[in-house]
Amino acid sequence: MAFTFAAFCYMLSLVLCAALIFFAIWHIIAFDELRTDFKSPIDQCNPVHARERLRNIERICFLLRKLVLPEYSIHSLFCIMFLCAQEWLTLGLNVPLLFYHFWRYFHCPADSSELAYDPPVVMNADTLSYCQKEAWCKLAFYLLSFFYYLYCMIYTLVSS
């Protein structure tokens, strides 16, 4: 039972993947709250409630913006670690999401983007639905990755 760099990579990935799972859950909850605010017809008649609702939407979008770069950075770190550890299968499983993150980051308009989660853009029903589906897909990916990393960590520790 030897401690290798690959085992260290899997251990660190487990901890960071747990953080990514919480990020994905937070995204799902935030988008669900935005969807609920979007469909509340009673509050639209009262200007006081409308201002409060708008502040709530801006607050949620601001918090969502704060989670984008850490998520992309952590996932990029996974790929760099597995590349250095020569864990090719694990790297191959992570590269599609890494490419999606790069595409999402570099193909967003400068003034208003889905990546930045601007309130007018996010409150579009199609964009909100897309973002919510994306969050569910990322949650599924991170959950599967978590258990894969756990298995690989145990296998690496036992086999070496």
From Swiss-Prot:
UniProt name for this protein: Protein cornichon homolog 3
Subcellular location: Postsynaptic cell membrane
Family: Belongs to the cornichon family.
Lumenal membrane side: 32-72, 160
InterPro entries in alphabetical order: Cornichon, Cornichon_conserved
GO term, biological process aspect, one: vesicle-mediated transport
Gene (name only): CNIH3
Source organism of the structure: Homo sapiens
GO cellular component, one term: endoplasmic reticulum membrane
